[in-house]
Amino acid sequence: MIGARVFKHSTVERMAKENQVPIINLLSDEAHPLQALADVLTMQQELGDLQGRSVAYIGDGNNVFRSLALASGFLGMEVRFSGPSEYFISDEDRDLSLIHI
């Protein structure tokens, strides 16, 4: 297993395609899954079951938001976002929390 902390997300994708071992994205410009995992584990530790709860993200629509929205949606949480208009989220990112895999 290889943990990759890279700038470009395409680097992680290329590594996964070219290697025989699993590649874990530790951080890229598109995603920060370990931060999302730490956030939801902390929320779960403090609040218990997260199903039906809401999480508010205030900031710019970046890799941290993207990963938190996906993780929160997977756990059945409602995601709310607020931030400056010049750093607002895309429609695709807005819909991430609606994806229940």
Which ranges hold each PLM region?
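Conserved anion/nucleotide-ligand pocket segment
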Residues: 57-86
